[in-house]
A protein has these predicted regions:
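Conserved class I S-adenosyl-L-methionine
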Residues: 474-483
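A short SAM/SAH-binding and catalytic strip from SAM-dependent methyltransferases
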Residues: 538-554
Length: 616
């Protein structure tokens, strides 16, 4: 059977190597790249560059016309970034608006990769603001607001994947005022709107284009309904109630001729529907429904021929026969527990596991054969997983604040090893102060949104950090971003130190204060509800920190004022451009992960020169 994913208006104007939107040019999550490595070296493919400073988030990259686009949360705001694909240097950064305070676990699981269409870039904030940016310099051309124009229940923030079709931008606010809306892509005017019905939270899946039955249409999940609407005017062509669709679908339907495969997480299983033409409309009949425990958050499916490759329970790769829904195999690997994401290119499956392992596999209905793996350097734990992207002979892997570019071409560079570049993305005063639609200049103070989610440091790593700092009785320890208070409690309880934890999240402040009181450490330990970037740190003897490189960079003015001899220990990340006095790797028995620790002593040594950024 022929795979029918139609992007007629896009394909002629795209370079073969581009990946300009969520799940690629045709939203199949299958790259058309050729000439790629079929097996990786023992330590993985070579890194061409890595860039840090994107901020918190797991949005995948979009690649088009020699640039890489993504979005992230840093300095109290959401930013859209454009980087030079060859070097990782920043081309521009545009502040979209203030970071919204949502559920601390869920807010970073939405993908929201930008959509690139020639001279324009379209992106959505978690607050529901849709922007059209100029690709050349990030200038805002127009914007809309889902929250005011198409309100709906969004318990975990907004997530949409704008799709360009000719001169229209197709968006899914998933509101009863507009479950799907066609905007004029040039000026943002509404062309048509399809009204929704029913109550309940909106979904988080993407829309795909199809020409099933010779009628151009958009296929998507709306609440508990799978449906198709006409591309011409948004009229509903068909719909089917999926009573097993739970918590809002996160998966993109897979379309093959007149058949539509609909997966869903939370135990919703998988269903196949067949469309039958009835005049200028269709009837959708369910052919089968089979149980399968797809990942609840990740849209990890690819359709290759007549088989679907995805992840099953525990992050195990799996193969499903499309025609019957039969699970042909599930593979137990050494890498995956919990969550994972995948893509397909050059007859290989690329898998990105939540523990930071990236692997390459040859897959077929007969089985799964691994062809190499590596672990992301200094992997940053996260509640979600960013999708790998294969484009322009490169594998793009985002790890929260950082983006890695790997060369996966079969021929390599042809000129021998190339030293990888390490780029720190800094923001200009203009970029920091630029007004977003939701707020003015960057906020400071304890009432703003956190810069990072709380990820507990294992207790055995905590003890190694304090030992590395040589904490002595009576010394003053500051923990910046103290979370549940475990570091300051350990410093007092095991080392006899006085300790202050600074935390911006009021819920964590309350939690850690209770823990301090329960252990009767009130005389030695204090928990302060503060913004660490506003503090005077000069009295500390020891400082512990677990922050992204861009946030470490913001601490620089405060750290330069430390008294001589103050020890600074960082978990996982180096202070950008400043060589550490000592660096160690700790193998934690608590989480079975490797953790990097770095030590500096004040005054800090001179910075290493940073790579130059591309001109704007």
């Amino acid at each position: 059977m022929r795979l029918l994913w139609v992007c007629v208006c896009w394909v002629p104007c795209l370079a073969a190597a581009d990946w300009p939107q969520w799940r690629g040019p045709d939203r199949s999550n299958v790259s058309k790249e050729t000439g790629l490595l079929q097996e990786w070296p023992a330590d993985g493919p070579p890194v061409r560059w890595q860039a840090s400073g994107l901020g918190l988030g797991i949005s995948p990259v979009s690649v088009a016309a020699g640039r890489v686009y993504t979005v992230g949360n840093r300095d109290g705001a959401e930013y859209a970034f454009a980087l030079d694909a060859a070097t990782g240097a920043k081309v521009w950064a545009t502040r979209l608006g203030a970071t919204v305070a949502e559920n601390s676990l869920m807010r970073w699981l939405t993908q929201r990769s930008p959509t690139v269409d020639g001279e324009r870039v379209y992106t959505l904030t978690a607050n529901g603001e849709l922007f059209c940016l100029r690709a050349a310099d990030g200038q805002k051309l127009w914007q809309k607001n889902y929250a005011t124009d198409f309100p709906t229940r969004r318990p975990w923030g907004y997530c949409d994947y704008p799709m360009v079709d000719g001169d229209r931008l197709i968006c899914t606010p998933f509101s009863i005022n507009g479950m799907i809306v066609a905007f004029n892509k040039f000026n943002g005017e509404v062309v048509w709107t399809t009204l929704g019905e029913g109550e309940g939270p909106a979904g988080y899946g993407a829309t795909v284009m199809s020409t099933a039955g010779g009628i151009p249409q958009y296929v998507f999940l709306f609440r508990n309904q799978l449906m198709g609407v006409a591309a011409e005017d948004g009229r509903v062509l068909w719909q089917h109630l999926r009573v097993d669709l739970r918590y809002g679908g996160t998966y993109t339907p897979l379309v093959q001729d007149l058949r539509i495969f609909s997966p869903n997480g939370y135990g919703g299983g998988m269903a196949m529907f067949k469309l039958t033409a009835c005049g200028d409309e269709f009837v959708a009949e369910q052919e089968y429904h089979e149980p399968f425990n797809f990942d609840a958050f990740q849209d990890s499916t690819v359709l290759v021929g007549d088989h679907v490759y995805t992840f099953g329970p525990g992050g195990k790769p799996a193969c499903i026969e499309l025609g019957s829904g039969k699970v042909l195999w599930e593979k137990e690997t050494a890498h995956g527990t919990k969550r994972a994401a995948l893509t397909y290119a050059g007859d290989r499956l690329y898998l990105r596991h939540i523990n930071g392992v990236v692997s390459l596999a040859e897959v077929s209905p007969a089985g799964y054969t691994e062809k190499g793996s590596f672990k992301i350097p200094l992997h940053e734990p996260s509640m979600g997983v960013t999708f790998p992207v294969v484009a322009a002979g490169r594998l793009w892997i985002r790890d929260n604040d950082r983006l890695f570019c790997y060369d996966i071409r079969a021929g390599g560079t042809g000129g021998g090893p190339v030293p990888p570049q390490d780029v720190l993305l800094t923001l200009t005063a203009e970029e920091l102060a630029a007004e977003g639609s939701a707020a003015g200049p960057i906020r400071q103070g304890r009432d703003r949104a956190p810069d990072a989610i709380f990820i507990p440091t294992p207790d055995d790593v905590v003890e190694r950090m304090l030992g590395m700092a040589d904490v002595k009785p009576g010394e003053l320890v500051y923990d910046l971003g103290s979370g549940d208070g475990r570091i300051v409690i350990a410093a007092a309880k095991k080392h006899g130190a006085r300790a202050v934890g600074y935390e911006i999240d009021p819920r964590l402040v309350e939690l850690s204060r209770k823990k301090v009181a329960e252990q009767q450490l009130d005389r030695l330990v204090t928990i302060e509800h503060e913004d660490v970037f506003t503090l005077d740190l000069s009295k500390a003897d020891v400082i512990t920190v677990f922050l992204y490189p861009a946030l470490m960079e913001r601490l620089k003015p405060q750290l330069q004022k430390l008294k001589p001899g103050t020890r600074i220990v960082s978990h996982q990340f180096e202070f950008p451009g400043v060589p550490a006095k000592q660096a160690v790797t700790v193998e934690s028995k608590e989480d079975n992960e490797s953790h990097r620790l770095f030590l500096w002593t004040a005054p800090l040594p001179a910075r290493k020169p940073a790579p130059q950024e591309a001109p704007r």
